[in-house]
Amino acid sequence: MKKIYDLETELKLIIEENVRYLKLDTANGDVAVPQVIIGPIPSENPEELVPAVGIVASSGKNTLESKQISIETSIVLYIKDTGKAYKTMYEMIENISKDILEKGIYLNEFEICTDMEWKIDCAGLYMAASILFNFIRIKTYRTDVDDWINGK
């Protein structure tokens, strides 16, 4: 499990670099750089946390040959101006996705798959998006299966 947290930490560094120049609206009328959190964005006191990005290893699947991990990146913005928030959200999705996919291999062990999904949802004063990234642990999970597949 430590390795998955290390992967989340690597993603956090990339996202922090990506959003550090943004000045986004908050519920209390200020502007702020989005906070980047490992784990889900807490639902209590959103006015103190939003804008925020959360990084969660949301699921995994072990097969005979590989270990797959899905990491969901959630973005929550306060909506002061719907058009501006909508445009900002799409820019954040595009930039974060590009930067995370570009690296390819993380920690010499996790390879990101090029297939990813994203979606946006608006609810009340907040706009939320999620980006789902899929990773495969590179051949450190089961090496004995190679002999079995190759008939040795």
Which stretches of residues belong to each language-model region?
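Broad gene-expression machinery/nucleic-acid interaction feature
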Residues: 50-52, 70-74, 128-132
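Extended hydrophobic/Leu-rich segments
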Residues: 14, 55, 75-77, 100, ...
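Short, charged interaction patches at domain edges and termini
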Residues: 1-13, 60-68, 106-152
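Small/polar-rich, solvent-exposed N-terminal microdomains that initiate assembly or binding
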Residues: 1-64, 149-152
